[in-house]
C-alpha cells in the first residue's frame, strides 16, 4: 500500500509538534502508512525539545527514529535562521520546499495522497513565493483550473458530518460581489456535487446554498445580487440537477442553525442537516465551521487528481514549542485522507 505524504509545514510553527503527537496516537500510528516529508534533523530537534518540557507526556510523542521520513535537509544558513515562534523567509523557503517534494512524489505515483501541515503565507511571500496558499500551489502543479476548498468535520456528539465548500476564498470582502458570477457558482456547485457523489458515495445529496446579503437581500431592499442573478441562477441549477436537492438561497444568519442542531444533537435526527453547504465567502463559511468544529475540521482540496487534506488551523507561532498544541485536527486530516484514498 502506498503511503500518504505528510509535510512538516512551516518549521517555526506547530507543524512538527502536531505531527509527533498525531503519529503517536494509537488510532493513527498503528493503522496508517505515513511518510513524513521534511527535515529529519528539525523533526528530531523538535522531539527532544518537547520531551524536555515537564508538562509533556513522553508517550504522547512518537520518536522520529520510528518514522518513515523523506529527508529534505536544509543548508546551514537556512537552518540557522529558523527559530520556533518566529516565521521568516527561511521558514517559508523550507515549507515551500517540503510541499514541492510531496507534490513531485505524488505526481510520480510514489504517494497515495498528501496531508499538509500549516504554512504561513507571509513567510512564503518573504521567501519570494507569491501564492494565496497551499491549495493554489497544488492546483497549479496538478494542472487543474477547477478546484475548491471543502471543510469537513464529523460531530463527536452525533457522528453527523459537516461539509462546507467556499465559493470564494482568500480575497478581501469588498471584492466578493465582483468575483462571484453565475459561472463561478456553477463551477463550485458542480465540484461539490461530484465530491459528494464520488468521494462520499451519496447518490442523492442535499445541498444548502447561502445568500450573499443579510436576509438574502430582502427582495432587493438589502442588496440586489440575490434578486438580479443568484436566485435565477439557482432555479436553473435545480432544473439541471434533478437528482440533487438544492435548498436556498438560505439567509446567511439562519444558514447554520440546522447544521448546529445536527452537530450538537438538538435536531429531531442528525439527517436534518444537509449533506453539503455552499458558502459564498471565507468568513461566512468558516466562522460557523470553527465555532462547531475547531479541533475536528479538516480542509480538503477537491478537483485535484489526488487526495489532499490538512488540519484547519494555522502555524500558531505564538504557542510553537510550548507543548500545548492539540493534534486532533491533524489526526482527523490523516484519517480522512486515508478514507478517501481507500474509497
Swiss-Prot record:
Subcellular location: Cytoplasm
Record-linked Pfam families: PdxA
Alphabetical list of InterPro entries matching this protein: PdxA, PdxA_fam
Annotated binding of a divalent metal cation, by residue: 170, 215, 282
Cellular component GO terms held in the UniProt record: cytoplasm
Cofactor comment text: Binds 1 divalent metal cation per subunit.
Record key words, sorted: Cytoplasm, Metal-binding, NAD, NADP, Oxidoreductase, Pyridoxine biosynthesis
Broad class of the protein's primary localization: cytoplasm
Role summary: Catalyzes the NAD(P)-dependent oxidation of 4-(phosphooxy)-L-threonine (HTP) into 2-amino-3-oxo-4-(phosphooxy)butyric acid which spontaneously decarboxylates to form 3-amino-2-oxopropyl phosphate (AHAP).
Subunit composition and interactions: Homodimer.
Name of this protein: 4-hydroxythreonine-4-phosphate dehydrogenase
Source organism per UniProt: Gloeothece citriformis (strain PCC 7424)
